[in-house]
Amino acid sequence: MTTFDGDTSAGEAVDLTEANAFQDAAAPAEEVDPAAALKAELRSKPGDWYVVHSYAGYENKVKANLETRVQNLDVGDYIFQVEVPTEEVTEIKNGQRKQVNRKVLPGYILVRMDLTDDSWAAVRNTPGVTGFVGATSRPSALALDDVVKFLLPRGSTRKAAKGAASTAAAAEAGGLERPVVEVDYEVGESVTVMDGPFATLPATISEVNAEQQKLKVLVSIFGRETPVELTFGQVSKI
């Protein structure tokens, strides 16, 4: 015969609902992969993603121009979304740290659309647009995995890097002496990008910033060399 400890007597029903509820509440929530979640969200939406050339530095203006044309030309049934991918980074200027939004793809915007003659013309003739990436008459849609890499917020994939930056900031705020960084990179050197949207791509160093431990490299994106800023830890020597 089964026995019970405490005040519960044998034969008396034991209500486990409360105990089970407590266990469910105490169980840690399953972590959601932000990349998988974003990919599932994008897959559920209509249209394909296309990359559009724009004048560097005018990406946001081109985005606004295109969104206005979508309304004026009544092509909202074909052109659904326009994005200028950005990432939040920490910059040091005049000895002060500040968070800034930096464009992931300088000189490009992303457009989610159904490709028709009308939608193609609406995008192609937008002021500031210089063309689609891909064939002139039939642009190539961007793979969904690439869209996720460009649109996923930086913090979702680089928590370790963010933690390292926070540690450095705390050390600086506490008056601790920062270690001397030995720079092992030089302008013109070829490296491989190891992290972020351009992981595995080769790049050429164009600038070295020892104080901020950052590099400016040239990466071939859609057939055009584009400057990208990376930390020392985001590249590897070839």
UniProtKB/Swiss-Prot annotation:
InterPro entries: NGN (IPR047050), NGN-like_dom (IPR006645), NGN_dom_sf (IPR036735), NusG-like (IPR043425), Rib_uL2_dom2 (IPR014722), Transcrpt_antiterm_NusG (IPR001062), Transcrpt_antiterm_NusG_bac_CS (IPR015869), Translation_prot_SH3-like_sf (IPR008991). It comes from the Bacteria. Keywords: Transcription, Transcription antitermination, Transcription regulation, Transcription termination. One of its GO terms (cellular component) is peptidoglycan-based cell wall. One of its GO terms (biological process) is regulation of DNA-templated transcription elongation. Participates in transcription elongation, termination and antitermination. NCBIfam families: nusG. Belongs to the NusG family. Does not interact with Rho. This is Transcription termination/antitermination protein NusG. It comes from Mycobacterium tuberculosis (strain ATCC 25618 / H37Rv).
